[in-house]
Amino acid sequence: MFQKEHLVKLANMKMPFGKYSGRVLIDLPEEYLLWFRKQGFPEGELGTLLALALEFQIEGLESVIRPLKQV
């Protein structure tokens, strides 16, 4: 289960490595997140957040997260 802090991090934390380095997690392409699910999410908080981002995208709930972005 996720915590509300996870939602804020999804909206603001940037991908630290890879093809989409620097992109906010909730804005990562679904195909990229599906690839991670197939290969295995990274361990720790980043993996948890990537899995959560995928679930929000699959359910079409990205619009719930985007208002939490801090300018």
Residue ranges and their predicted role:
Residues M1-V71:
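DEDD superfamily 3′-5′ metal-dependent exonuclease/proofreading module
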